[in-house]
């Protein structure tokens, strides 16, 4: 049975969050295609992962027999997250832009799962896992826009998820999400609506495509 690791990090509830809305569309389609499958869900806003500590960090590079009690406890929490990453056949991440980068809760999760010699290094343990990131943002930071150089979500996640963890990464980017609430952006409402519709369509399409891909891979 296929396993989906679904991570949300928006501080807003589903009805007020662009990223949650799109990840929900992906997940609904995924569950329709995998009625017997498993979903591991992490809502990092509701139940934050602890930020990395010296004990949690150093324990990852210490001989298990030599870890202190505090190191062992801290590493156990990391290990749970690492094993969820490794179990996943597909990973889905909601990553809204906050102050030009990812939410701190998502950064905390990444700091926990990135372990040199296991999930990172010469042979990352989750290498090749299909990963879809919904990178919503209030404005537009696309190439050619005035704030192109302020884009630190996709650039950062490319470095961590693709280059370091070796994941097979794709982005869905709902943009201009502040347009309905910001009168100064009223002229951009049609572009926002188009972006929202496209993002939901892409989520459904990608969920179906990944189902076909997994089916083909399992049939080999």
From Swiss-Prot:
Keyword hit for Flavoprotein: yes
EC number(s) given by UniProt: 1.6.5.-, 1.7.1.17
InterPro entries given in the database record: Flavodoxin_fold (IPR003680), Flavoprotein-like_sf (IPR029039), FMN-dep_NADH:Q_OxRdtase_AzoR1 (IPR050104), NADH:quinone_OxRdtase_FMN_depd (IPR023048)
Names of the cofactor(s): FMN
Top-level class of the enzyme under EC nomenclature: oxidoreductase
Disulfide bonds: none
Chain spans, region Disordered: 200-220
Binding site for FMN: 10, 17-19, 136-139
MF GO annotations: electron transfer activity; FMN binding; oxidoreductase activity, acting on NAD(P)H as acceptor; oxidoreductase activity, acting on NAD(P)H, quinone or similar compound as acceptor
HAMAP family with a match to the protein in the record: Azoreductase_type1 (MF_01216)
Task performed by this protein: Quinone reductase that provides resistance to thiol-specific stress caused by electrophilic quinones.
Quaternary context: Homodimer.
Protein name per UniProt: FMN-dependent NADH:quinone oxidoreductase
Organism: Streptomyces coelicolor (strain ATCC BAA-471 / A3(2) / M145)
């Amino acid at each position: 049975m296929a396993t989906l690791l679904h991570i949300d990090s928006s501080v807003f509830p589903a009805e007020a969050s662009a990223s949650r809305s799109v990840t929900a569309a992906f997940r609904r389609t995924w569950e329709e295609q995998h009625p017997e499958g498993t979903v591991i869900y992490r809502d990092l806003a509701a139940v934050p992962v602890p930020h990395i500590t010296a004990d949690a960090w150093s324990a990852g590079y210490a001989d298990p027999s030599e870890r202190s009690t505090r190191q062992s406890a801290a590493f156990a929490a990391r290990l749970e997250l690492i094993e969820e990453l490794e179990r996943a056949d597909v990973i889905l991440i909601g990553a809204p832009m906050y102050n030009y980068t990812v939410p701190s809760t998502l950064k905390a999760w990444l700091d926990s799962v990135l372990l040199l010699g296991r999930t990172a290094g010469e042979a990352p343990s989750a290498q090749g896992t299909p990963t879809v990131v919904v990178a919503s943002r209030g404005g537009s930071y696309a190439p050619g826009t005035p704030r192109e150089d302020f884009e630190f979500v996709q650039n950062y996640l490319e470095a961590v998820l693709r280059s370091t963890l070796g994941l097979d990464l794709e982005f869905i980017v709902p943009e201009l999400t502040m347009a309905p609430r910001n009168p100064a952006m009223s002229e951009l409402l049609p572009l926002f609506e188009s972006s929202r519709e496209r993002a939901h369509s892409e989520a459904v399409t990608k969920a179906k495509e990944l189902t076909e891909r997994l089916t083909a891979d399992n049939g080999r």
